[in-house]
Amino acid sequence: NQQSGXSETKVVVG
């Protein structure tokens, strides 16, 4: 998971 600006973005790479 990447966390930026106090918000969490979940990225799935296939």
Curated annotation (Swiss-Prot):
This protein's record includes keyword Lyase: no
The entry's keywords: IgA-binding protein, Lectin
Gene Ontology molecular function terms on file: carbohydrate binding; IgA binding
Keyword hit for Iron: no
Function: N-acetyl-galactosamine and D-galactose specific lectin. Binds the Tn-antigen structure GalNAc-alpha-1-O-Ser, the T-antigen structure Gal-beta1-3-GalNAc and IgA.
Quaternary assembly: Tetramer of four alpha chains associated with two or four beta chains.
Family: Belongs to the jacalin lectin family.
The name this protein goes by in its record: Agglutinin beta-1 chain isoform 1
Lineage: Eukaryota, Viridiplantae, Streptophyta, Embryophyta, Tracheophyta
